[in-house]
Amino acid sequence: MLSGCGLFGGNSYRFRMTVEVETPQGVKTGSSVYSVLGFTTSELITGGTSSDTEFKGEAAMVDLGGGRVLFALLRMANGTSADDNLAIMSMKAMDPDYDYNKKDSAQRIAAGRGIVSPAEVAPKDYPLLVTVGDMQDPTSVTRVDPANLAASFGPGVRLRRIVVEVTDDEVTTGIEERLGWLFNPNRKRISPDKKPEGIPLGNFDGLFSTRR
């Protein structure tokens, strides 16, 4: 079943990512909506072309109760560059013909042509997962192992799955209401000795929100 397909045309689409977590109190979910634009770029040196994406959105949050929140950030945990964002994750999950041509993939998804939606994200393509010990303190960000949520949140807590699907809903905003420091350059700046371990960027630019 395809939900929300063929709504945009061209080479742009929006998708919702939903994170499902099993807890002793039942399944908890959190989701966020993102926009993707695929386009072709020219290589000045070689004269050839390549493809890229314009991606907008913010981290998905799963409230696990007791002040505990799981964040699914905007980059894939196993990504090798800043280009490995959730736009690429969505293409890999929903477009069986994805071959790293981002514009063509965006066109197929926008048209609902040969895609799978909803689709489960493969564990190797999961986003970077973190939790925040103190919502007012960026140095308290801690990486979470998707295969062992219990280590961060206690017994009986397990990542069930991550699902993406095409949608016509608006892009999610408002993460700054939970993380007041996120758009404050002075509060967000972290000295090297206090930088959280396992987090690619010490100032979190582009990890929690594309608005920085």
Residue ranges of model-derived segments:
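Detector for Asparagine
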Residues: 11, 78, 85, 101, ...
